[in-house]
Design a protein with these regions (language model features):
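Short, well-structured segments within or immediately adjacent to enzyme catalytic domains
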Residues: 2-176
Length: 176
């Protein structure tokens, strides 16, 4: 289910680029930012997933929650109830605590093997140095997800393929 959700997020992001000159939400030019965010543009999950375009692509907040992330289930259930009211232009944003995934700033739709999004359990927001944090570590990292152990994560590529991942996939010499 988590990989399926990431696949849906990947498709939503690719759909967004088709309508925006090949640009992802964080790559928009000023006029496009105004169109999608009004005066509320911030490079953050809540604003991106609260744009009308992304909401239309995703259809429900439930896609933004991973079954591997029990800690965020209640917040996501509340977000699902308020889904119709979220609007980046008015500043009514979905809470980051309702989202189990992160977006990768260096993603490039023109490069199909780049990573668009991952589960939120990366140790660093840097794919070259990050590892997958796990609930089996002691102490448990803040960004660990209850259903994923150390060296377990999931990701979606710009070509739309979503998969499970290990630490061997990440880093300067990673498989991906």
């Amino acid at each position: 289910k988590c990989v399926n959700n990431l696949s849906s997020i990947g498709k939503a992001l690719v759909g967004f680029t088709h309508d925006n000159g090949g640009r992802l939400p964080w790559q928009l030019i000023s006029s496009q930012k105004r169109d999608h965010f009004g005066a509320n543009y911030v490079e953050d999950l809540g604003p991106v997933f609260s744009t009308a375009a992304m909401k239309s692509e995703l259809q429900t907040a439930e896609i933004l929650w991973s079954p591997c992330d029990a800690e965020r289930e209640a917040a996501n259930e509340n977000a699902a109830k308020g889904w119709s009211g979220y609007n980046a232009k008015t500043g009514n944003l979905i809470s980051n605590t309702a989202i189990s995934y992160v977006l990768i700033k260096g993603a490039d739709i023109g490069r199909p093997s780049t990573i668009l999004s991952t589960t939120r359990n990366l140790t660093f927001c840097n794919l070259a140095t990050g590892k997958w944090a796990g609930a089996d570590e002691n102490p448990i990292p803040d960004h660990a997800m209850s259903g994923l152990n150390k060296s377990q994560g999931q990701l979606v590529l710009a070509d739309g393929s979503a998969m499970q991942s290990t630490d061997a996939d990440l880093g300067s010499f990673g498989k991906i």
